Amino acid sequence: MENTSSSREQKNKRKYKKTTIISVLLAILLFCGFGYGTYVYMKTSNLVQKSNVNLARGEKSNLREETVKPITNNVSLLIMGIDENQERQKEYNGAFHTDALLLATFNKDDKTVKLTSIPRDTYTYVPVEKKKDKITHAYGSGFVKNGKDGGPQASVEAVEKLLQVPVDYFVKFNFNSFTKIVDGLDGIEVDVPVEFTEQNSKDEPDAIHLKKGLQKLTGEEALALARTRHIDSDAMRGQRQQLVIEAILSKLKSVGSITKLEKIVEAVDGDFKTNLAMDDILSFYKYGLNCSIEKIQLAGDDLYL
């Protein structure tokens, strides 16, 4: 009986020891996961804070009666892609153009995002210039007049004047950050509407060639698709930009790895500007997980002025 009791006690001890080891290992893994998640969150927060631009108008659009917040209110986000790269720094001296302008309006009630493409050569009143001009010039004019933070402000004002809707937030990317974001997502799936050849982000001619059809694009290829404008019209170019943005948003929804998110954070470091706070970005991300996208194209004619 004593041997049986002793044997049972030894088994129970081994079982308890095994359970304890597993519990400790799980606790360590959970702690490491939480710790790494906190690290990435803090890293992202620091990046956003470093990239933050306070518009001269303040937090609230002049077309709003009061300040709004993502999820709580219907809000808008202006996406700016500027034609900045290392080769153009000397030529432009900071006064770059907006190669892409898309206004995303978020409706909290029906969970939709309306993505409106604004052709770069849209001829409209540009407040910073106090005259009519191509909307693509607003960014550079704002930079020249009011310094590096004047570019986003001028583009926001021009879009508000054109559409007569408030622009609550903005994000500004350049060639470098755009290509790295797409590569950080391991590429994006796009149904390329037309075969074409285009220069790359370094302005090397005929460096990118894409065939028509559904395919996975690298950062350079996605940029070429968004930029090319000599094969048809400015309006069609806007539609291609919508396809690319939609593909990026779709891929972001499926990102399940925190390491991929960290890659994206590192990719845009120093190459983007925004007036979004970290909590705002998380709100937009949560909103985007369950929303549908409606693409809108401004009506107009292609005319040479």
Feature locations, PLM:
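Non-catalytic, solvent-exposed segments at the cell envelope interface
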Residues: 2-27, 31-305
